[in-house]
From Swiss-Prot:
<dbReference type="GO" id="GO:0070043">
    <property type="term" value="F:rRNA (guanine-N7-)-methyltransferase activity"/>
</dbReference>
<dbReference type="InterPro" id="IPR003682">
    <property type="entry name" value="rRNA_ssu_MeTfrase_G"/>
</dbReference>
<dbReference type="InterPro" id="IPR029063">
    <property type="entry name" value="SAM-dependent_MTases_sf"/>
</dbReference>
<protein>
    <recommendedName>
        <fullName>Ribosomal RNA small subunit methyltransferase G</fullName>
        <ecNumber>2.1.1.170</ecNumber>
    </recommendedName>
</protein>
<keyword id="KW-0808">Transferase</keyword>
<keyword id="KW-0489">Methyltransferase</keyword>
<dbReference type="GO" id="GO:0005829">
    <property type="term" value="C:cytosol"/>
</dbReference>
<comment type="function">
    <text>Specifically methylates the N7 position of guanine in position 527 of 16S rRNA.</text>
</comment>
<keyword id="KW-0949">S-adenosyl-L-methionine</keyword>
<keyword id="KW-0698">rRNA processing</keyword>
<feature type="binding site">
    <location>
        <position position="76"/>
    </location>
    <ligand>
        <name>S-adenosyl-L-methionine</name>
    </ligand>
</feature>
<feature type="binding site">
    <location>
        <begin position="127"/>
        <end position="128"/>
    </location>
    <ligand>
        <name>S-adenosyl-L-methionine</name>
    </ligand>
</feature>
<dbReference type="Pfam" id="PF02527">
    <property type="entry name" value="GidB"/>
</dbReference>
<feature type="binding site">
    <location>
        <position position="142"/>
    </location>
    <ligand>
        <name>S-adenosyl-L-methionine</name>
    </ligand>
</feature>
<feature type="binding site">
    <location>
        <position position="81"/>
    </location>
    <ligand>
        <name>S-adenosyl-L-methionine</name>
    </ligand>
</feature>
<keyword id="KW-0963">Cytoplasm</keyword>
<comment type="similarity">
    <text>Belongs to the methyltransferase superfamily. RNA methyltransferase RsmG family.</text>
</comment>
Amino acid sequence: MSALREKLDHLIGQTELEVSEKQRSQLVGYVELLNKWNKAYNLTSVRDPQEMMVKHILDSIIVSTHLQGKRFIDVGTGPGLPGIPLSIMNPDCEFYLLDSLGKRIRFIKQVIHELGIDNVVPIQSRVEEFQPEEKFDAVLSRAFASMTDMVEWCHHLPKEQSGVFLALKGQHPRDEIDLLPEWCSVTDIKALQVPELDGERHLVTLSRQG
């Protein structure tokens, strides 16, 4: 067993997550590809693959149990975070991964090809210019922008009645909440426990008022 797989198994063992053998292999494969491509394309500031397991994989999949719906868009996905790990964890759901930089989308296309992921749609576009044929159950954001910018730029993406915004944040974002537009309200804030991660993590759920 590889050191990366041992690390992943150890981290998952500290959570309530149920992760199959296939999913574990795909998550390790993703980190191996990210580490390989990162040397040439500078996709993440995290250089150590062991550290990627904590800061990128666990920090993403810990959100999995909080997803409701079948159709999601990850805006400002970068190299596919949290979209790729979440797509691996939720093979019955559809994930659109959006980023404006071509090198990131090329990497994501390579990942889904090599790992056999068939529930991801990569999109190269600015978020405010992307017009989906069908709206989404949730708009996901991790290290993308302030929550105000997120909801303003992505207001056209969630389903009118039931769609939500899910913002993955560090410390409790009290200051950002105070600045949200009047049409947007916070419906839930969950403190997330990410094994071996220094610092706090919070998942903020935002929805339209009324």
